[in-house]
Regions:
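Short catalytic/ligand-binding loop motif for oxyanion handling, primarily in non-cytosolic enzymes
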Residues: 91-92, 129, 158-162, 214-220
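A short acidic, glycine-rich active-site loop
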Residues: 173-189
Length: 302
């Protein structure tokens, strides 16, 4: 397995004029169409003041998905790599002491250097900590430049295989259906901060969508290419789960099946009590075993 192609970022950079044109044609705001360099400072940053059950459940889902994917690489017999946590893993919730300071620090880092992905994959034998999140941004980014790829991990409450099987049967039965497959979801506003990270670190990146039965992934280059070519392989929607923000939707079948769960996760209930006495209960996925598709991972590396 070789280190990523040195012209990876250059190839994405060449797509940007067409990306901007496509997004502008779809009515995306000008502020989301400025790629490269540090972003402008926001005049006012709204800081979350309270974390409720839905936020806590979503964070628990994300933590589980990231852990399941990391474990699949560590237990793979066909791929020898090192893997490290790299993205922001702040355990503080809105309203807790220290949250405001950490939130503002993370926003400023992202503005200057881009949004860092959750995991980094390194060639076997690379001497690297298993968790880079405690390092300074500069130190962590130095390690990122040695990586094969970064992986942004997304979670879903669906079983992808079951979803697609039901939709196929609906089509046979001529039942109306709006979407035949789940989608990779990328907020339009995230494109420029993903691009900024690529610009700073010059390491390729993937998006991985972890379901309760499988995991699918796509290279970020392909995401930019779909947008640049205005391909029919993507749409822009404003789903409620994304706070009605413009979101790029690409069918997971346009990517690669990165893994399948041989053991399904279980679920536990966790409870958090706020300082004012409000009790929030939420579900946390636990365990499960994701078996990595080694050939799919190799295909995803450009």
């Amino acid at each position: 397995m070789s280190i990523h192609s040195p012209d990876y970022f250059t190839r994405i950079k060449e797509l940007i004029p067409a990306v901007i044109q496509t997004l502008a044609n779809k009515g995306i705001e000008e502020k989301h169409l400025q790629f490269g360099g540090e972003a402008e400072k926001e005049p006012k940053i709204s800081i979350p003041t309270d974390a409720r059950s839905e936020f806590l459940a979503n964070r628990a889902m994300g933590d589980w998905a990231e852990g399941a994917l990391k474990e699949s690489f560590m237990s793979s017999n066909g791929i020898a790599v090192e893997i490290s946590h790299y993205g922001d893993t702040d355990s503080l919730a809105a309203g807790e002491p220290g949250f405001k300071e950490n939130y503002l620090r993370a926003k400023e880092e992202t503005r200057r250097w881009g949004k860092r992905p959750d995991l980094l994959i390194f060639p076997a034998g690379t001497v690297v900590p298993s968790d880079l999140t405690a390092l300074s941004r500069e130190e962590a980014d130095d390690f990122a430049r040695l990586a094969l790829a970064g992986i942004e991990v997304r979670s879903s409450k669906f079983k992808a295989d079951k979803y697609m099987a039901v939709k196929r049967q609906d089509k046979i039965d001529k039942k109306p259906s709006s979407r035949e497959t789940p989608s990779f979801t990328v907020k339009v506003e995230d494109l420029k901060i993903v691009y900024r990270w690529l610009e700073v670190v010059q390491t390729q990146q993937m998006y991985a969508q972890v379901f309760f039965d499988s995991c699918f992934a796509i290279n970020v280059y392909a995401i930019f290419e779909y947008v640049a070519t205005a391909s029919k392989g993507f749409t822009i929607e404003k789903p409620e789960k994304s706070q009605n923000k413009a979101t790029i939707m690409i069918p997971i079948t346009n990517g690669e099946r990165l893994g399948t769960f041989s053991v399904s996760p279980e679920f536990g209930v966790e409870v958090r009590e706020t300082r004012t006495g409000r009790v929030d209960a939420y579900v946390r996925p636990q365990g499960g075993q994701l078996v990595l598709e080694e050939e799919a991972f190799k295909k995803l590396l450009l």
